[in-house]
């Protein structure tokens, strides 16, 4: 299996992709197009599949890999990409940060954020000046202070397997609450951390 977000370095005849051939999780690999074979594992996570591998066309390097534990995380191979994300995350705390698009010089970006209490916002970011400007709020009608936080939990099943999930509690209430279990589809699917209107409605009603 290879991922559709794979990138190639046509000058070196290499393909950077995700593969689970010979392993039970999607990992970032380097593939030699002339040999028709995988030549290197760039990164693999011991618990989860990788979501994507990203390539800088300007610098001709693999910049980072994205994966989801309880929330989206990255491992970096490129200091410039790492610096951009770390700066944005310092300016936009308590949310996931995504680079939606960029210019050819890879120094001007459209940035998307989201969290467990908001559908997020779009920003314009100029990396040369570190200017970050709000373009639009996706859900300006939501008052985050009135909404519930979602946090990760895990527990052991009867047969000894670790089950991961999320717990959302009404603000200011922690004990003796009625519980609604909201399972995801699948079995290949999983829930992710972010804004869920159904969950927020139930938390607002005291569940």
Name what the model sees in each region:
Residues 15, 28-30, 62, 74-75, ...:
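Hydrophobic beta-strand positions in blades of beta-propellers and related beta-sheet-rich domains
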Residues 13-23, 43, 63-70, 76, ...:
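Beta-strand C-termini and the immediately following turn/loop, strongest in propeller blades
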Residues 1-7, 11:
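Single conserved hydrophobic/aromatic residue that forms the stacking wall/gate
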């Amino acid at each position: 299996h290879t991922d559709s977000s794979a990138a190639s370095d046509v000058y070196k005849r290499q393909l950077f992709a995700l593969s689970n051939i010979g392993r039970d999780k999607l990992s970032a690999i380097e593939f030699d197009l002339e040999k028709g074979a995988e030549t290197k594992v760039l990164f693999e996570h011991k618990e989860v599949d990788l979501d994507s591998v990203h390539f800088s066309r300007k610098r001709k390097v693999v910049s980072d890999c994205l994966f989801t534990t309880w929330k989206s995380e990255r491992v970096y191979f490129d200091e410039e990409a790492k610096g951009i994300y770390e700066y944005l995350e310092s300016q936009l705390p308590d949310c996931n940060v995504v680079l939606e698009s960029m210019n050819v010089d890879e120094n001007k970006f459209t940035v998307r954020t989201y969290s467990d209490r908001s559908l997020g916002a779009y920003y314009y970011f100029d990396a040369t000046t570190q200017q970050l400007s709000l373009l639009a709020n996706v859900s300006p009608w939501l008052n985050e202070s009135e909404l519930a936080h979602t946090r990760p939990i895990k527990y052991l099943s009867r047969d000894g397997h670790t089950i991961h999930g999320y717990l959302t509690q009404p603000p200011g209430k922690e004990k003796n609450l009625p519980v609604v279990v909201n399972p995801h589809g699948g079995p290949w699917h999983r829930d992710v951390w972010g804004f869920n209107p159904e969950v927020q409605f139930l938390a607002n009603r005291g569940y």
